[in-house]
A protein has these predicted regions:
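Short, conserved beta-strand edge motifs with alternating hydrophobic and charged residues
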Residues: 28, 49-52, 87
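Nucleic-acid nuclease catalytic cores
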Residues: 74-102
Length: 123
């Protein structure tokens, strides 16, 4: 239950950060059937699909990406939307890593991102 609370708190925090940056941000909180993403953020005609993950152990294992998330993010891209992102919170920093980047790393056999990778691939 602690992980769920950490995740929910991070989703709320990220929505507040996005709103402060001028985005309209909506958190798909309290979803019973499991949505494929946590947040949609819109600004200047661009919509961003974001899944927020807390990385308590300084790694983001790709096994945490669910199949329905991959399918939804692929469809999001096919519909000509902006690339979806994973917002990774690690050591009180937030790293925005693009889904296409992660998908490419998975194809190359990578199993996770460590803190060094988050700094390298994140914005």
């Amino acid at each position: 239950m602690i992980n769920k609370k950490l995740g929910n708190d991070f989703e709320q925090e990220l929505c507040e950060i996005l709103a402060d940056a001028g985005y309209w941000a909506h958190n798909f909180a309290n979803r019973k059937n499991g949505q494929p993403a946590d947040i949609i953020a819109v600004k200047s005609g661009g919509a961003y699909l974001i899944d927020a993950k807390v990385c308590s152990y300084e790694v983001f294992p790709f096994r945490r990406i669910e199949e329905n998330q991959q399918l939804a993010m692929d469809m999001w891209i096919e519909c000509n939307n902006i690339e979806p992102y994973f917002a990774l919170k690690c050591r009180n920093e937030i790293y925005m890593v693009g889904y296409i980047t992660i998908k490419g790393l998975i194809k190359k056999g990578k199993k996770q991102l460590n803190l060094e990778d988050m700094n390298k691939y994140g914005t």
